[in-house]
Amino acid sequence: LFERVTYVGFAVPGIVLALALVYFGSGYLPWIYQTLPLLVFAYVVRFLPQAVGSSRTSILQVDPRLVEAGRTLGESSLGTFKRVTLPLTRSGIVAGAALVFLTTMKELPVTLILRPSGFETIVTQIWRAQESALYQYAVVPTLILLLISGLSMVVLLAQEGGQEGL
């Protein structure tokens, strides 16, 4: 049920989510409006399904007999999770984190609407330069974004390659 609820944030367009949080934040919680915590909350709502889906897939691949074996050998639930489940699901969790990082880096509507005054990201720098037709100022941030995106893809593909052997 929790997993399905998280998909709502992914289905809603970013601009709709951002405007809803502007309405809620400015009307009911003015002290949180245009703060970093509100922006982070919007990112969590927007991109949590990617992390949950990736992690869920990894967890479903864990053989329950391995977890049972850890428990019968005297490990606590937490110990079994740390020593058995977590190592087996680590690649899926890392892939989910890389995917969320990659999509968060490219998110524009939520960032433009909810960012605190004076808070700049790579995407907002590119947007501002493009909006002013100062394309020469967009080159360096664009190249940085491409480099970060490329490295994130390398991490994702490396994780995928590591899962092929399972």
Residue positions per predicted region:
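Membrane-interfacial helix termini and adjacent extracytoplasmic/periplasmic loops
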Residues: L1-E3, I15-L48, L66, L78, ...
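Hydrophobic core positions of alpha-helical segments in small-molecule transporters
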Residues: V5, F41, S55, F81-L86, ...
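Hydrophobic transmembrane alpha-helices
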Residues: V5-V12, L38-P49, A98-M105, R115-S117, ...
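Transmembrane alpha-helices
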Residues: V12, V45, V52-S55, D63, ...
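A structural signal for multi-pass alpha-helical bundles of membrane permease subunits
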Residues: A18-L29, A42, S54-R56, A97-T104, ...
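Hydrophobic transmembrane alpha-helices of multi-pass small-molecule transporters
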Residues: Q50, S91, S149-M153
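C-terminal transmembrane helix and the adjacent membrane-cytosol boundary/short C-terminal tail
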Residues: R56-V67, R71, E75-R83, V139-L166
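Interhelical loop and adjacent transmembrane-helix boundary motif
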Residues: M105, T111-V154, G161-E164
